[in-house]
Regions:
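Short amphipathic alpha-helices and their capping/turn segments at secondary-structure boundaries
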Residues: 1-7, 94-105
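Active-site mouth loops of central-metabolism enzymes
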Residues: 16-35, 82-93
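N-terminal catalytic cores of secreted or lumenal carbohydrate-active enzymes
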Residues: 81-82, 99
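Acidic (Asp/Glu)-rich catalytic clusters
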Residues: 67-75, 97-108
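N-terminal small/glycine-rich loop or linker at the start of catalytic domains
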Residues: 5-28, 109-113
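Catalytic domains of carbohydrate-active enzymes, especially glycoside hydrolases
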Residues: 35-57, 101-109
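Glycine-rich, proline-tolerant flexible connector loops at the mouths of alpha/beta enzymes
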Residues: 48-74, 82-91, 112
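Short, well-ordered coil/turn segments that N-cap beta-strands
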Residues: 9-13, 47-49, 75-80, 106-108
Length: 113
């Protein structure tokens, strides 16, 4: 089986890649928006199942823009995931800007920490 004809097989390992978020936290690493788009396309070409695109929130404009542009990437295999946190105890979830940003990313998958 090659990456170009990957199909779901029960018991098969699925890959969830967090390079665009967690990898960007390494010392000396700062992905540009163009870097993030190219990496996402290459991960899709490799057959990665899930790509964590980043942490869209009002204080992170690069990741917000990535998710805006990601909708038009035309990924063939991979599904994008947005990463974020639950609502803070002191806020009404309907008023939480970070939760709203996760929804605005319009991904099928959201990873919550």
């Amino acid at each position: 089986m090659t990456a170009t004809n990957l199909k779901y097989i029960p018991g098969m390992v699925e890959i969830y890649d967090s390079t665009l978020r967690d990898g960007a936290q390494a010392e000396g690493i700062s992905f540009s928006l163009e870097d993030k788009i190219l990496i996402a396309q290459k991960l899709d070409d490799f057959g990665v199942h899930y790509i964590e695109g980043g942490y869209p929130n009002p204080t992170n404009p690069k990741d917000m823009e990535f998710f805006e542009k990601a909708a038009s990437l035309g990924l063939k295999k991979a599904k994008l995931a947005a990463f974020g946190s639950t609502c803070r105890a002191s806020l009404d979830p309907a008023e939480d800007r970070n939760l709203r940003a996760l929804l605005d990313a319009e991904t099928e998958i959201v990873t919550i920490f």
